[in-house]
């Protein structure tokens, strides 16, 4: 059976298990202390301390993904990120996402499992709202439309911050990776740029998308850097971590990168500063 058809018939349950494993992992991430930031000893690597399956979360995604009552909601996705909203809701962000319906067993492939039709809609990104541990709704998908033919946006880290420094109003800012279709080895797309989307709160309406780090001028795609693998706020700065795609081009290792932005200015390209190993450029 072709791999694409096999993948399409899977229900949300499988994703939920993977999601639980990823969320159960205890990842230790830290910024260097003041001395290290100014060129002192490099911070040591961090490793996974432990992990365990989050059964309640797995079951909730299985319930929501396998619900056959709607034809326009999430039934499975990858590239999972989440962000807590000021009103207590949790917003789940996904990259490639299946919509449509999931059907109960038996399925036409002869297995006793739920199944998804081969013509199920696939979008490049989606967002699902959770309240008090229960998934409520899928926002209109794709939430972030393709920037150009042959290109798409994958959401990564997200952060609630003031609309501008010191402003009382808060907004949600979502880091986006822009990729473009390309030949092997770029099976996940050629890196193009990092963007920042601003969403209003509490209605989660996309107000704008701004390109903050365009990489199209870097000739070697494996050296193009995308930001947003994760982020952390400290001392009035938002630190944004990123990386390149050297391993996609069979290089030994990919490299990590770091940028920082004053709190409230993630959507301003001129406010971004990049660590070059000895200072912020």
Provide a role label for each language-model segment.
Residues 3, 7-32:
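Secretory targeting and sorting signals
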Residues 30-179, 190:
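N-terminal regions that are enriched for targeting/export leaders
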Residues 45, 50, 129-138, 201-211, ...:
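Beta-strand initiation motifs
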Residues 78, 88, 154, 192-195, ...:
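Residues that flank catalytic or metal-binding motifs in active/ligand-binding sites
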Residues 80-85, 159, 199, 229-232, ...:
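Conserved catalytic-core segments centered on acid/base and nucleophilic motifs
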Residues 98-115, 182-198, 248-259:
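Structural motif
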Residues 187-188, 198-227:
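Short N-terminal edge-element motif at the start of the domain
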Residues 228, 232-281:
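Active-site cradle of extracellular carbohydrate-active enzymes
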